[in-house]
Every structure is written in C-alpha cells, then in structure tokens.
Amino acid sequence: MAVTVLPSVSGLSAVASSSNLRRLTSASNHRLTAIKSVTSTSSPPTPSSGVQRRRKNNDENRATVAKVVENPYSKVEAARPDLQKRLSDFLEEAREFVGDGGGPPRWFSPLECGAQATNSPLLLYLPGIDGTGLGLIRHHKKLGEIFDIWCLHIPVSDRTPVKDLVKLIEETVKSENFRLPNRPIYLVGESIGACLALDVAARNPNIDLSLILVNPATHVNNFMVQPLSGMLNVLPDGLPTLLEDIFDFGFKQGDPLTGMLDALSNEFSVQRMGGVGGGMLRDVLAVSANLPTLSRMFPKDTLLWKLEMLKYAIASVNSHIYSVRAETLILLSGRDHWLLKEEDIDRYSRTLPKCIVRKLDDNGQFPLLEDGVDLATIIKCTCFYRRGKSHDHITDYIMPTTFELKQQVDDHRLLMDGTSPVMLSTLEDGTVVRSLEGLPSEGPVLYVGYHMILGFELAPMVIQLMTERNIHLRGLAHPMLFKNLQDSLVDTKMFDKYKIMGGVPVSHFNIYKLLREKAHVLLYPGGVREALHRKGEEYKLFWPERSEFVRVASKFGAKIVPFGVVGEDDICEIVLDSNDQRNIPILKDLMEKATKDAGNIREGDESELGNQECYFPGLVPKIPGRFYYYFGKPIETAGKEKELKDKEKAQELYLQVKSEVEQCIDYLKVKRESDPYRHLLPRMLYQASHGWSSEIPTFDL
C-alpha cells in the first residue's frame, strides 16, 4: 500500500521498513502530487446558480473568456456511489503491513487522504484487534476530503503494553494540539482502539477532543475468551507457520486455483450482481484467497497478547470513565456483540457528558468494512463535524455529494412520482412560467411560504431547485430536528435528510449569518403550528403578528420570494388531530412528552402561533392528486435598509409578503381545477403513451 510518510512524532517512526522506505517515499510523492492536482468530484462546489460564468485572463492576448460551469446536480439520476475498497482490498494491503519486518508502533497517512480541505481537523485512527491501521480503508477517500487522517499501525510482533500505547497516542495528541491549538482532534477507535481513545481523553480533559467509538470493547466475554485462550495455549508453536507454508505453497504453486478464485470474485462482484449477495460472495472468496495473510496477522502468541491487552484496556477505561469530558459518538452494531454489552453502552451514554449513540442495526462486529456504512455521512447526519471549538451549522456544513442527493431522490421517489409536482415562477416582467427561471440566481435570497402538513412539500421543492437551477436551499428548521435524544419517541435517523440537505436550527442569529453568506434561505414563519395543523386548517397561515425577517433581509439587500403550495388535501386527510389525541389518555401522554422534548421556541407567545403541540397526526391516504408550487415575483430590499428600519414600513412589507403568499395559494387552488392531469389515472395514461420520463402537461398559464 502506498502511504504518506509522516515525520517522527514523539519517537514514532514512519510506516515503512528501512528496505522499502525509499520506494514508498518516491511513490508517495508522485501520487500525492497527482491527487492534489485533481479537483474532487465527490463534493461539488458551493452552488449559486444553475449556470455560472467565470472569467479568466489570457496571458498571451489579455482576452476575457467566458467559461460555462455545468450544474453538478443536473444528472443526479445517473449518480453512482463513490468507489469504495472492499474486504479483499483490506486483506491485500494488510499483506504489506504484516510483512513489514516488525518495529515499534507508528503513524501513517493513506494517500487517498491527500486532498483534504483547508483547516481540516486531525483524525487519528486507533485500530482494533488486527492492529494494521487499515480499518478505515473503505472510507479513506471520502473522509480524506474533510480530515487530515493519521492511522496507527501496530506490527504483529510488537508487544507494547496498553499503558505505553496510551502514552504514545497522548504524546501525539499533545504535540498536535500545541502546534495547532484551535484545531479539534478526532480519535476514531474500534473495539480495543476505542478503549485507548477513552483512556487518552480521560487523561487530557483540557484538550479539544472528539471521540468516535465503533463497537467499543466494554467487557471480556469469558464464555468465549477462556476456551479460546486454553485452546491457543495447547496448540504447538509451529502450527501457524506450518499452516502458512501450506497455504503459501497452494496459492503460489497453484496458479490455476488463484486464477479461478480471482475470476469468480470478479464474476460475482457487486456491479454484476447488483446487491449485497454478490458482495458477500466476493468477500468470502477474498478471505479464501488471503488465508496466508490472516495466518500471519494472527499467530498464536499475538492472539494471546491481544487477549491480555483487551482485559487490561477494558479495566483501565472502566476505572476512570467519569474523567472523560470529550464529546462522543458511539456506533453500535445490531449483531455480534462479543466484546460489548448494551448495558455498558447505556452507562457510557449517561456518564459521558456529550454522548450520541448511533445504532447500525444490520451490521456485525466490523461495520467499517461492511456495505451500507458510510462514516463520513454518519458524521454529517449527527452534526459531529467541526473545524473550531463547537459545531457551526453554517460554516461546518458539507455540501451533499451527487450520490447523497440521489439517495434523497430515491427515498422520496414514491411521493415525487405520485404527485408529479408542477412548479411555476414569476419573471421580472410579471410573466408566470412553468419552470424555475424566475428565481434569482445570486444570493442572498429569502424564500418565505406556506408549510404543508408534515412538510410534504419540502423534498420535491429542494430537490428540484438543486437539479434544475443548482440552487441550494438552507432551510430554517425547528431545533428539535437537531437534538440527539436517546430516549426519544421517534428514531432520530428520520431527521438525517434535513441535516444532509443543509437544514439549520431556526434563530435570528442563523438567519443573519446565512444572509450574510449570500445563501438561499428557506423560512416558514408558521413553523410547527403550520406543519402540524388541525382538521380544516389546510392552507391557513399561522404567522406572527409582527415582522420578524424584513429588517434582517434589508440589511443585506436580500430578495424576498413569496411562494405558495397546494396539494396536501389531494394526497391525505387528517382524521386524528391534536384535539382528538388530547382526549385519548395514551396519545395525550405521548403528545405531552414529545412537546416537552421538542421545546417551544415561541414560549410566552399568547397568540395561536405559540400553541406549538408536537404530535403525529393520524392521516388517511388518498389516491394521490398533484402538488403545485407557485413562486411569486421577487421583492427587492436592496437600498431600503434605512427605510425599513422604521417599524411601520417594515410591517407594511411584511404584510405584503404574507398577502402575496395567500394570493399564490388562492391562484393555485383555482387553477388546479382546470388541470386535466390533476388526478393519477390521466397522468399514468399520458406517461404510458409518451414515456415515463416525459413531463406531464398542466393547466394553461
């Protein structure tokens, strides 16, 4: 494996033996240069419009040339997941590490991680029982774009005690913290590596650390460990070497066998099989073809040493777990808990001051090497990424990759295909067009509109703006969506989509910061009260009596785009609202707990808007009709800052925006009556004759 050779830190050597150091260094320099010269394709640039024009000077003739930059999200349907290495790659690259000639533990930086952004935090990976340091191999490329990654390699023959490993990691942490004191340091530990991370954090409560613990070892299962230790003790010392020689002879001399395994592995790859089964068979074949590597990785004496390390590390962590002050993210597999107890994880989550537990229900003991686990996405979804002292939802936000957007499209496919959204916008001359052409390309822009029940309108609108115009809406959302409550009534994973797509907790300060950054901001003044309205309240606005956004918009000269949406009454009917649930004791208790957990951001407001009860409305689905969106003509505030400082003037503009939102809704309610394709059957017949990807007509404008 090619690596970046790191300078020696506190006695730690680079991950290369003396015989191959020059070769690795040469390869590293070449590959690192190549990586830095290529722009990453997995994280698109910050968008501002569908088509951007950049001008550059020609040194020869000083001519100005316009270059058109395509929307990176325009072909989202064709997006594919980032190429990730597999278990077979892990075993292939582990072969080089197992045969590295021994030596002390040392740090290395994979060359896939050579293109990180500026001011990226440091990530130190602490390996599990294998000790290779390659446990993040499937995640190197994606994590390497947002972190400066160092991985700890512990050679097979190394017998460094746990307390010395902790000191070694601690010295590196202190050295890097001294060098860049404002940069957070992430410790990612797997099983026994998680114990080392907790030990380091407990010994250094004043250093800015973030811990990501993957299936942390919390107890030794004597039912499994004692028989294993006894069996290893009675095995002859030469048995691993004998097995290694047998495997080596079989695979070195039997080229046809090796070729057959490679051919089968390629034949049943995920690309050909298109599912988990193919990948699983590929991994089984990969293990079969790399048994010599496994025998070298876990010889008898090394396994016995690792078991002793495990016992000591767990005892050490449990003795001072109360000293840990770092924020912690625990990733807990749903299967194969042979080194942890869920009771211990519950104790950790209560003991550690800032702890998030994320369950990976479908994964086993080594989730970072399994399909379906993307550590970078998990970090985004838990708001665990930061470049400073605390997470900033605006400056620390990472744009979704094209594949992450495609996942959102796939997740909402039924809603989008079932409702065939019609989106209208208004040009500067007042002409209404069926497209998003009338929306401003450059920010700051504030979109103000009506919230459907449960926010059904959000996904089609946000996705359409990104794919058609490359406009990324930063939605202002209720803070409850960003809370990681362990005893919540709902699975907090259902809120991941809001964090991936750029949601921000609503506050005056966040509106200010977003508009200052010239963002496209989505605001629902009606908030929770509108999104969880009661029977008969469809299309009714629950807005504050006084202006809350006009003056901050005028401060930055933001355009205000009023919009309305209709269609919720064509897809469902509310049969059990908050008034009904309040009369049912069980549902009443659940509603009160949900409201308490969420908190009321308008506490003290005696108007109807302050009555923010959190509940899940009982809905009866209908044969889906159609969603209609109407974006009104943008309202200019540039140059009006002084004028709008006057409360009465600001209130006039506020009422104008509210009136235009109501007019947009009324316009759509009337016009949809003349849409021949409002109902599902005519739309299906149209697409059956014109193609399933064809745009379905609507009413005349």
Curated annotation (Swiss-Prot):
<protein>
    <recommendedName>
        <fullName>Phytyl ester synthase 2, chloroplastic</fullName>
        <ecNumber>2.3.1.-</ecNumber>
    </recommendedName>
</protein>
<dbReference type="GO" id="GO:1904963">
    <property type="term" value="P:regulation of phytol biosynthetic process"/>
</dbReference>
<dbReference type="GO" id="GO:0004144">
    <property type="term" value="F:diacylglycerol O-acyltransferase activity"/>
</dbReference>
<dbReference type="GO" id="GO:0033306">
    <property type="term" value="P:phytol metabolic process"/>
</dbReference>
<dbReference type="GO" id="GO:0019432">
    <property type="term" value="P:triglyceride biosynthetic process"/>
</dbReference>
<keyword id="KW-0012">Acyltransferase</keyword>
<dbReference type="GO" id="GO:0010287">
    <property type="term" value="C:plastoglobule"/>
</dbReference>
<comment type="function">
    <text>Acyltransferase involved in fatty acid phytyl ester synthesis in chloroplasts, a process required for the maintenance of the photosynthetic membrane integrity during abiotic stress and senescence. Exhibits phytyl ester synthesis and diacylglycerol acyltransferase activities with broad substrate specificities, and can employ acyl-CoAs, acyl carrier proteins, and galactolipids as acyl donors.</text>
</comment>
<keyword id="KW-0150">Chloroplast</keyword>
<dbReference type="GO" id="GO:0010866">
    <property type="term" value="P:regulation of triglyceride biosynthetic process"/>
</dbReference>
<dbReference type="InterPro" id="IPR007130">
    <property type="entry name" value="DAGAT"/>
</dbReference>
<comment type="similarity">
    <text>Belongs to the diacylglycerol acyltransferase family.</text>
</comment>
<keyword id="KW-0809">Transit peptide</keyword>
<feature type="transit peptide" description="Chloroplast">
    <location>
        <begin position="1"/>
        <end position="65"/>
    </location>
</feature>
<keyword id="KW-0808">Transferase</keyword>
<dbReference type="Pfam" id="PF03982">
    <property type="entry name" value="DAGAT"/>
</dbReference>
<dbReference type="GO" id="GO:0006995">
    <property type="term" value="P:cellular response to nitrogen starvation"/>
</dbReference>
<keyword id="KW-0934">Plastid</keyword>
<feature type="region of interest" description="Disordered">
    <location>
        <begin position="37"/>
        <end position="64"/>
    </location>
</feature>
<dbReference type="GO" id="GO:0090693">
    <property type="term" value="P:plant organ senescence"/>
</dbReference>
<dbReference type="InterPro" id="IPR029058">
    <property type="entry name" value="AB_hydrolase_fold"/>
</dbReference>
<keyword id="KW-0346">Stress response</keyword>
<dbReference type="GO" id="GO:0009507">
    <property type="term" value="C:chloroplast"/>
</dbReference>
